[in-house]
Amino acid sequence: TALGHSASKAEDATIDYLQSDGAYSAHQHRQLKMLHEMNTRHFEKSQDPQLDGVIRSYELAARMQGVAPELIDLSNESERTRNLYGMDRKETLDFGHRCLLARRFCEAGVRYIQVSTPYVWDQHNNLVKGHTRNALSVDKPISGLLEDLKQRGMFDDTLVVWGTEFGRTPVVQGKNGRDHNPAGFTVWLSGAGVRAGFSYGSTDEFGYFAQDN
């Protein structure tokens, strides 16, 4: 389920159609109960597995309406925690917000969480300036997330994967930029028993092509 999109501000992100008119009112409870009874009776006759999936999706949506609004509300997070994620600085505020949301969803038992950045990394020009700015925006928040997971006893049970769809070429393109390079780039993992300091595979001397594993 998407919470906003990568181009939107984290503070404005919400789940589409999360709230309906009179959410969790007695009237809505009656509607959901009647819908469940009708779907269940139909499933007993047809044994259609797709209908079973529909029933479970409605049940999940109803539970999300009750839980998700609280999860995306950061008002009860302390100033210390916000600062840990870099939310006290303009450069790191947005991605810090995203990483803090990820920790809250992890605490709630969400099994897979994707945290995205805006589409600002495609540096076909001015790579040094652009990547310096972009790296600054994510370094503090992601380190804050890792530290927060550790201090809450969640680090050893949470696999954090930092990756991208491709890297950049080691040769110049345009005005001091770099082209896409899917042939050799880095992904790092942390937590969940991953061995610290271990690297797998290597590239050639220019960092252009993967040559081992």
Protein language model regions, located:
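Ligand-binding pockets and gating/stacking loops
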Residues: T1-N213
